């Protein structure tokens, strides 16, 4: 009898071990709302990491939740399948011009980790990186940006998030009914979720760095100055944009929301009726209505985006960004050498330069987004002529003056607002602010996405190129030559050292001088060159035209 019991016991133990070992091939994590099962991926150089995709961090913003601030995620029964990404939020497909993609149920995030807590015998928690995607607040999704370069040799937990876009994310009635900024409040909800749950993935909630490029950079800067986001992160990386860029704060959002209500056959005089009616309309139709505010070639950048909230119990943006005090944490800010090149390339497609020459006064206010800033038509047209004379003299817009067009867009849309943000944060904070200009141009660029023939290695890096050397961008070029791989290591090192210590590239700390706290001092920054060298530089300005302030 004893032998029989022993045999049965061993058999049960074997079966139990077999089931446990088999189950262990599927990584599982317990978060506050339930259990999730993920999968595996491999980094650029073949390191195996865990991935948990499409995790809901808030309730679906559908039906009565449409236009509401994000609502708490509801617990689920069973095991959540986190091996496939969640849907992108409704927006315009990049490069398509007008195609609407995504779903309204879209508030998901993705978590990547090199090791889970049970594998970490020392019990040390890892630094956390949260990436907020760009896309003008009307396109993009978190899954497009992966940590496959960052996690090659670094033990970080990486999170990417989705948030509501366009009208569904940023409509406002200008009062307490629909206060606006729901897309940014989604991001806050994601940051709160991370505070509650990231330990389950081995992450340290007290060491969170938020990053973003373009509208993602604007988002990061907005979190840096929003009282709603205080205490949710410890460092910030801002790439190619800021809350001070003209496109970052949308104008006349309440008026635009009423216009959409009228377009959808809804009342326009009562905010409650506007919102109730719009909740009954097809989500894709509302998302597509965004295009009514981009009259030429998807300009202006952001008809709907962050807006100052005039009412509400808790405001994300209680005042204009320039009047808000930033949280006192280390900040790393950057800009590409030729931010405007991607836009001048896009504008030159399909006879665009001729259209621009023939309709300069009409198109320029939309390209540079001062169509609302300067309401007087005569003054608006005069400003257009002043700008043309400043950048082009008496020359027409053409392939020969494309660099002039790039410079104009760089100055107005990125250079002024980004450098101003760096100076503002540095002047207010005790923590250091670092600024660098990315000057390396490799085998691939965003420019090649629109016009491959116009791009060649060493041309000039443009908007978004820098990010592709830190985060693997889904569907884009994979760098496979020695120089580009070297730049990946360089950029990853800059980020990694900043994430760990609040100081970038600690081996060359004498070159990384913080931005001066005195606004009267020359602007200090580090230049990353085509030869992959670092140069400490100072300028009285960052190259932005002096009269640019007048129409900012």
Swiss-Prot record:
<comment type="similarity">
    <text>Belongs to the type-B carboxylesterase/lipase family.</text>
</comment>
<feature type="signal peptide">
    <location>
        <begin position="1"/>
        <end position="23"/>
    </location>
</feature>
<feature type="glycosylation site" description="N-linked (GlcNAc...) asparagine">
    <location>
        <position position="443"/>
    </location>
</feature>
<feature type="glycosylation site" description="N-linked (GlcNAc...) asparagine">
    <location>
        <position position="371"/>
    </location>
</feature>
<dbReference type="Pfam" id="PF00135">
    <property type="entry name" value="COesterase"/>
</dbReference>
<dbReference type="InterPro" id="IPR029058">
    <property type="entry name" value="AB_hydrolase_fold"/>
</dbReference>
<dbReference type="InterPro" id="IPR002018">
    <property type="entry name" value="CarbesteraseB"/>
</dbReference>
<keyword id="KW-0732">Signal</keyword>
<feature type="glycosylation site" description="N-linked (GlcNAc...) asparagine">
    <location>
        <position position="81"/>
    </location>
</feature>
<dbReference type="GO" id="GO:0106435">
    <property type="term" value="F:carboxylesterase activity"/>
</dbReference>
<feature type="disulfide bond">
    <location>
        <begin position="89"/>
        <end position="106"/>
    </location>
</feature>
<keyword id="KW-1015">Disulfide bond</keyword>
<feature type="disulfide bond">
    <location>
        <begin position="266"/>
        <end position="277"/>
    </location>
</feature>
<comment type="function">
    <text>Overproduction of nonspecific esterases is a common mechanism of resistance to organophosphate insecticides.</text>
</comment>
<feature type="glycosylation site" description="N-linked (GlcNAc...) asparagine">
    <location>
        <position position="404"/>
    </location>
</feature>
<dbReference type="InterPro" id="IPR019819">
    <property type="entry name" value="Carboxylesterase_B_CS"/>
</dbReference>
<keyword id="KW-0325">Glycoprotein</keyword>
<feature type="active site" description="Charge relay system">
    <location>
        <position position="339"/>
    </location>
</feature>
<keyword id="KW-0378">Hydrolase</keyword>
<feature type="active site" description="Charge relay system">
    <location>
        <position position="463"/>
    </location>
</feature>
<feature type="glycosylation site" description="N-linked (GlcNAc...) asparagine">
    <location>
        <position position="269"/>
    </location>
</feature>
<protein>
    <recommendedName>
        <fullName>Esterase E4</fullName>
        <ecNumber>3.1.1.1</ecNumber>
    </recommendedName>
</protein>
<dbReference type="InterPro" id="IPR050309">
    <property type="entry name" value="Type-B_Carboxylest/Lipase"/>
</dbReference>
<dbReference type="InterPro" id="IPR019826">
    <property type="entry name" value="Carboxylesterase_B_AS"/>
</dbReference>
<keyword id="KW-0719">Serine esterase</keyword>
<feature type="active site" description="Acyl-ester intermediate">
    <location>
        <position position="214"/>
    </location>
</feature>
């Amino acid at each position: 009898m004893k032998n029989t019991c022993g045999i049965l016991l061993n058999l049960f133990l074997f079966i139990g071990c077999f089931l446990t070992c088999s189950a262990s091939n599927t990584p599982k994590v317990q978060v506050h709302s339930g259990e999730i099962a993920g999968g595996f991926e491999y980094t650029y150089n073949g390191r195996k990491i865990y991935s948990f995709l499409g995790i809901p961090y808030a309730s679906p913003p559908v039906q009565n939740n449409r236009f509401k601030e994000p609502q708490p995620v509801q617990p689920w029964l069973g095991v959540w399948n986190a091996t496939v990404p969640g849907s992108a939020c409704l927006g315009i497909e990049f490069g398509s011009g007008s195609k609407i993609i995504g779903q309204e149920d879209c508030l998901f995030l993705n978590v990547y980790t090199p090791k889970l807590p049970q594998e970490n015998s020392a019990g040390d928690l890892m630094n956390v990186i949260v990436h907020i995607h760009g896309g003008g607040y009307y396109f993009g999704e978190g899954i497009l940006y992966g940590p496959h370069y960052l996690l090659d040799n670094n033990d970080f937990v990486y999170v990417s998030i989705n948030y509501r876009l366009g009208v569904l994310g940023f409509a406002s009635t200008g009062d307490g009914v629909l206060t606006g900024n729901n897309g940014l409040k989604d991001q806050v909800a994601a940051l709160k979720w991370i505070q509650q749950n990231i330990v389950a993935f081995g992450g340290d909630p007290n060491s969170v760095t938020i990053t973003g490029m373009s509208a993602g950079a604007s988002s990061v800067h907005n979190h840096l100055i929003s009282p709603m986001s205080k205490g949710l992160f410890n460092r910030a990386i801002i790439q190619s944009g800021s809350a001070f860029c003209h496109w970052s704060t949308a104008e006349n959002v309440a008026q635009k929301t009423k216009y959409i209500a009228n377009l959808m056959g809804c009342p326009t005089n009562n905010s409650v009726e506007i919102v109730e009616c719009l909740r009954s309309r097809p989500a894709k139709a509302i998302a597509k209505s965004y295009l009514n505010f981009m009259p030429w070639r998807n300009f202006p950048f952001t008809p709907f985006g962050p807006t100052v909230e005039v009412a509400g119990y808790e405001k994300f943006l209680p005042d204009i960004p320039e009047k808000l005090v930033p949280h006192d944490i280390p900040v790393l800010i950057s800009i590409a050498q030729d931010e405007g090149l991607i836009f001048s390339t896009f504008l030159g497609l399909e006879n665009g330069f001729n259209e621009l020459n023939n309709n300069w006064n009409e198109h320029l206010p939309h390209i540079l987004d001062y169509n609302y800033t300067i309401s007087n038509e005569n003054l608006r047209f005069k400003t257009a002529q002043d700008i043309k004379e400043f950048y082009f003299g008496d020359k027409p817009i053409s392939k020969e003056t494309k660099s002039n067009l790039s410079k104009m867009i760089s100055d107005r849309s990125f250079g002024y607002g980004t450098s101003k943000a760096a100076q503002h944060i540095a002047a207010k904070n005790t923590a250091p602010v670092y600024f660098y200009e990315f000057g390396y141009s490799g085998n691939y660029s965003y420019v090649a996405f629109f016009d491959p023939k116009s791009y060649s290695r060493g041309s000039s890096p443009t908007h978004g190129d820098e990010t592709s050397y830190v985060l693997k961008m889904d569907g884009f070029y994979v760098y496979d030559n020695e120089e580009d791989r070297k730049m990946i290591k360089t950029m990853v090192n800059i980020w990694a050292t900043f994430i760990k210590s609040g100081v970038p590239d600690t081996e060359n700390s004498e070159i990384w001088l913080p931005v001066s706290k005195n606004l009267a001092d020359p602007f200090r920054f580090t230049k990353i060159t085509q030869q992959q060298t670092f140069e400490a530089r100072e300028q009285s300005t960052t190259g932005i035209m002096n009269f640019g302030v007048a129409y900012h």
